[in-house]
Structures are given as structure tokens and as C-alpha cells.
Design a protein with these regions (language model features):
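Non-catalytic structural scaffold of enzyme domains
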Residues: 1-147
Length: 147
């Protein structure tokens, strides 16, 4: 696995990755966790595996959202078509009564307003990029290198 190689090569240098950051934030606080990501990420089972390492009892519901990346890259950030597509992708996750939704792709925060509108305020959105930055800040603070 690529992460293992990076960790080995890094030695004592801390390594932060978005999957670990997103799973830490979700699996330590929630039991019913939704994950949306690209088909490749969903098929890899990376998020459910990582979540279950932290919280074996967690129920993880994953949904591939194949059209989100092309829509973001085409600039359909606040386009009505995005909302229609997002409703289709998110309905199965909403029906599972998840407590949080992990944005499992770095493109997805760009459409988080649309996602939040559809899932409602009762489902917490977890942006792994933000949690990775928080982890970096904690590491820098712990090593007294935060300036």
C-alpha cells in the first residue's frame, strides 16, 4: 500500500493523510457514518476499513458519486443540475439515518453547500481536509514549531 511506503520513507517525520484524518473525526464521535467518494475510493474500502480500525461497532454506509468530480471540474458548483445529481446520490445515505457524512474526495468541499442543503443540519459534514489541517496544527504545536 502506498501509505505504508510513505510512512516507511518518512521515518520520524509525521505523515498526515486525509483518510486517516476523516476517519478519526467521524469514528471517534459517531456510530452511523456515511461516506461519499469517487467509485475508485469506495471500491477500495479504504474508509470503512480505517473507520472500523478505530470503531469496530460503527455502521458505515458508502456511496459512490461518480459525477461530482466532473461537475466540479466543469464549474457546476451551484448549478441546478448538481442539486439534482446530489439528491440522487445522497438519498440512500439519508435513508440510513447517518449521524455524519465524510466527504471522501478533495473535490467535494467545493460543493458542500449543496450537500448540506440536501442532507440537512441534523447530519454533520466531516471535511477531511479541515481535520488534516487541525492535525497538522496539533503536531506543530506539540513540537513547538507553530509560528
Amino acid at each position: 500500500m502506498a501509505k505504508d511506503t510513505v510512512l516507511q520513507l518518512a521515518g520520524n517525520i509525521p505523515v498526515i493523510d486525509v483518510i486517516t484524518a476523516g476517519t478519526q473525526a467521524s469514528a471517534t464521535l459517531y456510530q452511523r457514518i456515511g461516506v461519499i467518494a469517487t467509485p475508485a475510493t469506495i471500491n477500495s474500502q479504504a474508509y470503512p476499513r480505517a473507520i472500523h480500525q478505530i470503531n469496530p461497532a460503527a455502521q458505515v454506509y458508502a456511496q459512490a458519486c461518480a459525477l461530482f468530480v466532473p461537475m466540479v471540474e466543469e464549474g457546476f458548483i451551484e448549478h441546478p443540475a448538481l442539486e439534482l445529481v446530489a439528491r440522487e446520490y445522497l438519498q440512500p445515505i439519508i435513508k440510513k439515518n447517518v449521524e455524519c457524512l465524510v466527504l471522501g474526495c478533495t473535490h467535494y468541499p467545493l460543493i458542500s453547500k449543496t450537500i448540506a442543503k440536501i442532507i440537512g443540519p441534523q447530519i454533520k459534514i466531516i471535511d477531511p481536509a479541515i481535520t488534516a489541517c487541525e492535525e497538522l496544527s496539533n503536531i506543530l504545536r506539540a513540537n513547538n514549531t507553530l509560528n
